[in-house]
A protein has these predicted regions:
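Active-site-adjacent bridging/hinge elements
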Residues: 35-43, 65, 98-102, 126-133, ...
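Short, glycine-/Ser/Thr-/acidic-enriched flexible segments
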Residues: 46-48, 85-86, 181, 190, ...
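Feature 926 captures the class I aminoacyl-tRNA synthetase adenylation module centered on the KMSKS loop
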Residues: 199, 394-459, 464, 506-549, ...
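Phosphate/diphosphate-binding loops
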Residues: 315-340, 732-735, 810-818
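Extended, non-catalytic structural segments that build the interaction scaffolds
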Residues: 5-6, 109-117, 260-278, 372-388, ...
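Short hydrophobic alpha-helical segments that form membrane-spanning helices or hydrophobic packing faces
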Residues: 170-172, 224-226, 354-355, 468-470, ...
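N-terminal, positively charged nucleic-acid-binding surface of large information/translation enzymes
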Residues: 2-232, 256, 273-305, 324, ...
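Structured ligand/cofactor/substrate-binding pocket environments in proteins
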Residues: 55-67, 74, 83-84, 152, ...
Length: 878
């Protein structure tokens, strides 16, 4: 193709045309006919918020690189896209948009609001994903709010219930007062907080004194069921077995002992209330203490709080502290740092409440989960320990019921006669118990039921994604299960990874995937995690519009799995500069390519063999790096090769062969075409738009590149000796080019004579023509040994700042002497005697500056350039 038809500069706006081409051609369709090895990616289903953020970009670039690399290596890749629709984020957004709470409208109306918003957001995110060049097979898209996926989730519930792995019980659970729902421990985040530690006197019931407790939760005084001290704490040995009265409430509670009390914290006296934290739960269970509910689902005090009933928690805390002060019970307050558990969605501090909820029996399966996790490949491998540590820390089962609306309904009714749990048949699924009735009577014969109104934790949908993409339980699901790869962030190892291994293993007896690649978080340029509140968020569209998706993909790929990644505009600009440099190289090469480019190398030009050796070594490095999921290593190797070896060195070294019709011209064209085509293919998983765009100009169909287009490795081209000899020639060429540049000599101006000295002329005798013609040298010689040179001093000047102060009235004599004598003779005297005497004084080398030139054995003035292996002499151009 003529260069007249190719834009002068790289135009990233062509990316949109390629997106349309890939969709139109079904380039990334999963075939599934067994004719190729399959590679299955268990793609994360994001919440449909309507916007991709940089964390999405990073995660999906990782998996897209892998998908593209595998397709290019003739794998049949299943790269689906799912949407985890249900849960709090959508409900919270709907409440915000419509200025309502979930209970202000009917369940059906609220659910419809959520569905409409979700559909809109999914469509927005689909478009953004396509702009990024992600190669999902959109025929394998799943949306968790659709009936077929609700059926799958509910079926998994029935199967685990029938295995006694799901049960209902009254148990302490984590509760979010803002979202008004139970949440699992994995959904609790911890943030640092400074609060007041309040020292409060509890009077002994027998009047013998006080027990001073230290608490950060005085609002829970009404729910205090005991006071506890360490059995070996001698300060309180006289209190063992006694009772104390609660301030304000005047109710008596026992003083008990427990070895888990920290005597160093506060006063060493702790009140047990229901419930301040998990330790309270353990003590209440251990000592069979009463449970007093003090806070309701909205985070307001219950009637047991007396005059504080109806107050929000913070308001009650403030009021009760004031009353404790007034009544003389509050001894002092001091600041204390603590980790507060908050809801991971709305960041509201969680409360522990006792509720009847549905649970998955996790604790009985932790050993199985760890065993399955160990059998998988983790990249990086230390991420496995996050899951192992989480599994070993589990002391509560997974609470899966939620008091929300927009989620998969729990498929349960309760018989109004015998109160048994009634389940639907598998054929009836999916069901909404608030709308549907079971398709059979209760075992007692009753046909009157009360529906379960709670819904399932959204992780119940997303923790079976390997089964979802396999179309479980429909025939043939086993052919694409388990998945090959689970790509995900390290922040959801304890949720998505843990729950998926648990549920899929419980349902199938097999692990859900073979490998996990873990990505980190994205940080802003200020070094903090990207956050709206910090104002450091960069929207992907802002980068794509200005620099294109491939520049953003290059930034993403230049990172290490598991590590957090800082965003930097300078990295984006550098990536774009790289693409423009390669584009310019392509335009130059294309100008010289024609239908006569040979199919193979016919000559022995070392520079050609040098670049082909380095090209195939690059192929090997990049292939190994992709197999190891080390994208940064692959990208950096490509950068270095394209920028330096190919553009800066090889192209410059062969230009003369392209402009002259000589024997080696055809080989130069073959080599240029081979290098650019191979490099574009190696880059294609990272920069699919750029590689496809240029490849089409070079005559390759889009599918040829993306399907089966990974370049063949030619080991026979890799030659250490060739690379060494080629590097010698490149070093000399570089030195001569730099010399011309630094001396203001045009690159196309002839150099008269260049003499090269070395210990072994064989190192460069095969590359003399390339050195000579690349640098426009008229005469070039190569000799063994070192050059015979002498340094000639051509001028000498006194250093006035030293001569004046030191020699005072004699300074003029020294200045006159230096000006009137041959600088070469003065230099010889200084070298021989160390000084020159002028009248009553003498000066040394430290009193003068000199300018010298090198002179060859035959008297010519020369410049010398040095590399590690060579001395290069040039006659000074007059």
């Amino acid at each position: 193709m003529s260069n007249n038809d190719i834009p002068k500069d790289y135009d990233h706006t062509t990316e949109e045309e390629l997106q349309e081409l890939w969709q139109r051609d079904n380039t990334y369709r999963f075939i599934g006919d067994g004719t190729k090895p399959t590679y299955i990616i268990d793609t994360p289903p994001p919440y449909p918020t309507g916007k991709l953020h940089m964390g999405h970009v990073l995660n999906w670039v990782y998996m897209d690189i892998i998908a593209r690399y595998k397709r290019m290596n003739n794998f049949d890749v299943l790269f689906p896209q799912g949407w985890d629709c249900h849960g709090l984020p959508t409900e919270v957004k709907v409440e915000e948009i419509h200025d309502i709470k979930k209970n202000d409208v009917s369940r059906e109306t609220f659910r419809d609001y959520c569905i409409d918003l979700t559909h809109d957001n999914i469509e927005k995110m689909r478009l953004q994903m396509r702009k990024m060049g992600y190669s999902q097979d959109w025929d394998h898209e799943y949306i968790t709010m659709l009936p077929e996926n609700k059926r799958r989730t509910q079926l998994s519930f029935l199967k685990l219930y029938n295995k006694d792995m799901i049960y209902q019980d009254i148990h302490p659970i984590n509760w979010c007062p803002r979202c008004e729902t139970a949440i699992a421990f994995a959904e609790v985040e911890y943030k640092d907080n400074t609060t007041k530690l309040n020292y409060v006197n509890f009077p002994a019931a027998d009047g013998s004194g006080n027990a001073t407790i230290a608490t950060t939760r005085p609002e829970l005084l009404c729910a205090c069921v005991a006071v506890v001290v360490h059995p070996d704490d001698e300060r309180y040995s006289n209190l063992h077995g006694k009772t104390v009265k609660l301030p304000i409430y005047n109710r008596e509670v026992k003083i008990i002992t427990d070895e888990t009390v920290d005597p160093e914290y506060g006063t060493g006296v702790v009140m047990i209330c229901t419930f301040g934290d998990k330790t309270d739960v353990e003590w209440v269970t251990r000592y069979d203490l009463d449970i007093i509910d003090a806070i309701d689902e909205k985070g307001e005090m219950l009637p047991v709080a007396g005059k504080y009933a109806g107050m929000p928690i913070k308001e009650c805390r403030k009021a009760i502290i004031n009353d404790l002060k007034e009544e003389g019970f509050l001894i002092k307050q001091e600041d204390v740092d603590q980790n507060v558990g908050v809801c991971w969605r709305c960041k509201t501090p969680i409360e522990i409440m006792t509720k009847k909820q549905w649970f998955v029996a996790v604790k009985n399966m932790t050993e199985d989960i760890i065993e399955q996790a160990k059998s998988m490949r983790w990249v990086p491998d230390h991420m496995y320990h996050r899951l192992e540590n989480w599994a070993n820390s589990m002391d509560w089962d997974w609470c899966i019921s939620r008091q929300r609306i927009f989620a998969t309904p729990i498929p349960v009714w309760y018989c109004n006669d015998c109160h048994k749990v009634v389940l639907p048949s598998e054929e009836q699924l999916p069901v909404d118990p608030t709308i549907d009735q079971p398709d059979h009577a209760c075992s007692c014969g009753c046909t009157s039921f009360t529906p379960e109104e709670d819904v399932l934790d959204t992780w119940m949908d997303s923790s079976i994604t390997p089964l979802t993409i396999a179309d479980w339980p429909n025939p043939g699901w086993e052919t694409v299960y388990p998945a090959t790869l689970r790509p995900q962030g390290h922040d959801i190892i304890r949720t998505w990874a843990f729950y998926t291994i648990l549920r899929c293993y419980a349902l199938t007896g097999e692990k859900p995937f073979d490998e996990l690649v873990i990505n980190g978080m994205v940080f802003g340029e200020d070094g903090h995690k990207m956050s709206k509140s910090l104002g450091n968020v960069i929207q992907p569209e802002a980068v794509i519009d200005e620099y294109g998706a491939d520049a953003l993909r290059l930034w993403s790929a230049n990172s290490v799995p598991g590590a957090d990644v800082p965003f930097g505009w300078k990295d984006i600009k550098h990536a774009y500069k790289f693409l423009r440099k390669f584009w310019n190289a392509f335009r130059f090469i294309n100008m010289h390519l024609d239908e006569n480019v040979p199919e193979e190398l016919s000559g022995d030009n070392i520079i050609d063999k040098w670049i082909l050796s380095k090209l195939n070594r690059l192929n090997k490095v990049v292939t190994d790096a992709f197999e190891e999921y080390n994208f940064a290593k692959a990208e950096q190797a490509i950068y270095d090769f394209v920028w330096h070896d190919f553009c800066d060195e090889y192209i410059e070294a062969v230009k003369y062969r392209l402009y002259e019709d000589i024997d080696s011209t055809a080989d130069a064209k073959y080599t240029l075409k081979t290098v650019i085509e191979t490099t574009l293919a190696l880059m294609a998983p990272i920069t699919p738009f750029f590689s496809d765009n240029v490849s089409q100009y070079l005559g390759k169909e889009s599918k040829e590149l993306h399907i089966g287009g990974w370049p063949e490795l030619h080991e026979e081209y890799i030659d250490d000796d060739v690379e060494l000899i080629g590097s010698y020639a490149i070093d000399i060429i570089d030195e001569l080019r730099r010399y011309k540049s630094s001396h203001g000599i045009p690159l196309n101006q002839l150099l008269n004579t260049v003499n090269i000295y070395t210990e072994d002329v064989k190192k460069i005798e095969t590359t003399i023509d390339d050195i000579k013609n690349t640098n426009k040298v008229d005469n070039i010689t190569v000799q063994n040994g070192k050059p015979d040179l002498r340094e000639k001093v051509i001028s000498m000047e006194p250093i006035m700042s030293k001569v004046g102060p030191e020699f005072k009235q004699h300074a003029k004599d020294i200045i006159s002497y230096i000006a009137s004598n041959d600088p070469e003779e003065i230099a010889e005297k200084l070298e021989k005697d160390g000084q020159v005497i002028v009248g009553e004084v003498a000066f040394t080398k430290e009193h003068v500056t000199t300018e010298s030139e090198l002179v060859s054995q035959t008297g010519e003035v020369v410049d010398i350039l040095r590399t590690e292996e060579f001395d290069i002499l040039l006659e000074v151009q007059q």
